[in-house]
Amino acid sequence: MSLRWLGPVVVFAGLAAIGFFPRNHAQAGEVSSITHYKVLAPIRHGNLTVFPVVAATTHDTRDFLTLDEGLRSGDVVVTEYSNLQGMVRRRQPGGGEQRSNRAQVNTLVLVNNSKRPLILLAGEIVTGGKQDRVIGKDRLIPAESDPVDLGVFCVEPGRWTGSSDKFNALGGPMAQPAVRAKAMSDKNQAKVWEEVGKSRSGMMAQVTAASPALAATSSYARVMDNKEVQEKLDSVAVPVERDYRSLIQQLREHNAVGVIVAVNGEIIWADIFASTDLLQKYWPKLVRSYAAEAVGTHAKAQQADEKTAQAFLDNMEGRHQTVESEPGLYRQTEISGDGFKAFELTSLLPKTIFDLHVAKMAE
């Protein structure tokens, strides 16, 4: 049995000024002819502030599949490496058989049987198997793919026994920004575990009487799925989600495509998509991840303003750039600048050559 690993090409470049967003700074409330993005008045609840972002233009993303959609339809299959038998679509010329009698830590494989390319976002949590795991980077999986390495980090230290042979991300959590940042930027399992521990402790501190089962679990997903934790998250996420969904409907013709996130008045994150439709598909997961960051963070509440949010979005001048590419499929660009890192996922598929998602984190 042969296994086709889609191997990206990685290019490093040290540059003085790099930007997939152009370098001028738009005034808050004005659409820049260069950046094409405008930050709107914020939605606030507690210590969480979300700034809607609208675009001058958007793209048709109907040809792309999300992980939730693929799992729901059964077109996408996720399994441990040891369960590959029978999943390979075709043999490669001269390819030998590759077998494994046991699962390998952090090695999941995915098959996309759909006729649409699959979007994977860093931070999506896949539960089941030997451990719960988080996807480590944004990427595209081609339509009707052979098994590919999913590229994950464990978010459940201490367990390496099967809870279920079935993997699921449908309706599951998106890791909060602090955990996403460790997976995307540090790319280090120990640092991911460390941040999971901090996030888990911060969340449990908000639960008045944590159950013994909750206190005993090392699973990030199970903590987030706890009833009392859910109530805490709902108290922040539901009002913000409701207000933003209403705003999206009102601003659909103005191309609402993303958000900038502040916690305790400090800008921490931005998620920008190629279309309103794509944003709406991820919004329920995203807003709860932002709420988890806010609920688990203790600091004196301040307020970020539109000008600060617009400046954060516009500043894409970088000292260093890393480009990872699977020719003809996608390109991921990582930009390191003063006080931030940004990650741009660009489709290279015919007729859909545009940025699908941009994630930007404050450092």
What residues fall within each predicted segment?
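Intrinsically disordered, low-complexity segments enriched in small/polar residues
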Residues: 19-118, 123-363
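Bacterial N-terminal signal peptides
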Residues: 9-19
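Bacterial N-terminal signal peptides that target proteins for export
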Residues: 1-10
